[in-house]
Regions:
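Gram-negative and organellar
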Residues: 1-280
């Protein structure tokens, strides 16, 4: 049973299904699933949906790991295809390469004017970790996004390119310096109107660990974009709730921007509560 909500309502879905993991060979795993959902939205018509997926992961080779998943979901109003792909490869003891891709296609069966929605996110990166001292790690990443809609009333064709550098430095165990730099270019067409936007971002964070459970941070950022520039500064105190889970309370002045989503992931002046979990 699942429950999701937003600012003014809740949507519920009762689900039943089966998941299987097939160990084909050493280091090769196939995952399959089938699920039926009874959708019970707070507002709007009720409905049913069926979802099926198949995925594979190959990790027998110590040099690289490759995996992917394809999912199909159908309901009375829409059909959806969702695909993911990941490839990690060790270049040497300190360097590795990363490739990621996420694809989502949605077809509206009821409203022909809604058209089809196609989204794709492609990432290519190179990561460095100093295993000898474990004091410095860095990531250089390129991301290319496409967002296409064939809706008759509001057709859209958008492409976004993001180039970013991320670095973490630990001079001593209790101190962490984090820096990020990014460039973003957006080319969008809505109907017959085309617009372009580009921006540059610099951000940094200084974190001090008082104990293994409590820390404090100071962060700042500056973003320059077409026709505008924003900056922000903030302070945060954090506590480790359980292993790999942290809760942070911060106050920001101005607009603090993170490179993860660039202009979308921004914190305006005020108090903010943040929950982080690190997956292995």
């Amino acid at each position: 049973y699942r429950l999701t909500g937003n600012s003014n309502s809740f949507d519920a879905a009762a689900s039943v299904g089966v998941r299987n993991q097939w160990n084909i060979a050493e280091g090769l795993v196939i995952n399959t699933s089938a699920e039926r959902q009874a959708l019970r939205p707070f507002e709007g018509a009720k409905g049913d949906a069926v979802a099926m997926s198949v995925g594979a992961l190959y990790s027998a080779n110590p040099i690289y790991k490759i995996g992917g998943k394809l999912e199909y979901r159908t309901s009375r109003p829409t059909d959806q295809w969702n695909g993911t792909f990941a490839y990690d490869r060790k270049l040497d003891s300190n360097w590795s390469a990363i490739v990621r891709d996420l694809f989502l296609y949605t077809h509206d069966k009821w409203d022909t004017g809604a058209g089809d929605q196609t989204q794709n996110r492609f990432q290519l990166g190179v990561a460095y970790r100093d295993l000898e001292t474990n004091k410095f790690n860095a990531l250089a990443r390129m991301e290319y996004r496409t967002d296409i809609s064939t809706a008759s009333a509001d057709p859209k064709d958008s492409t976004t390119s993001i180039f970013s550098l991320h670095g973490n430095y630990h001079p001593v165990r209790s101190t962490t310096l984090n820096g990020q730099a990014a460039f973003k270019y957006v080319n969008e067409t809505f109907g017959n109107v085309t617009s372009k936007w580009q921006g540059t971002l610099l951000s940094g964070r200084f974190t001090y660990d008082f104990t293994d459970r409590f820390d404090a941070s100071i962060m700042a950022s500056r973003m320059w974009g077409t026709g505008a520039s924003v900056s922000g500064i903030g302070v945060e105190v954090g506590a480790r709730l359980v292993d790999n889970m942290w809760l942070g309370l911060s106050y920001n002045k101005g607009k603090y921007v993170d490179t993860e989503l660039f202009s979308s992931n921004a914190s305006w002046t005020g108090w903010h509560l943040r929950l982080n979990y690190k997956f292995h």
